[in-house]
């Protein structure tokens, strides 16, 4: 599956547009992680626990988007975008979306 955040993929021609595809996941924060990350936040620096959480969530959302594209018979997704939003006080949603296409 070829992915691109632009309207095209170099060296490929879009021969059919199959429609919007998306994948999402909602992740809740971990109380234990919140405590350690809160202490680290006082000292400054990267909050690696949250970085890992968001990276894993983005990967899962992207994988789900790809599964939806494959179900349509696509071999590419163009205009790929990611969004995040807060869910309640302790959760975050990651949404990956794009346009499923057939390429030549």
Swiss-Prot record:
Family annotation (InterPro entries)? UPF0145_dom_sf, UPF0145_YbjQ-like
Q: Gene3D superfamilies this protein is in?
A: Hypothetical protein apc22750. Chain B (3.30.110.70)
**Could you list the residue ranges that cross the membrane?**
none
Q: Which SUPFAM superfamilies match?
A: YbjQ-like (SSF117782)
Q: Which family does the record claim for this protein? A: Belongs to the UPF0145 family.
Concerning HAMAP family, the annotation shows: UPF0145
Name this protein carries in UniProt: UPF0145 protein Hlac_1015
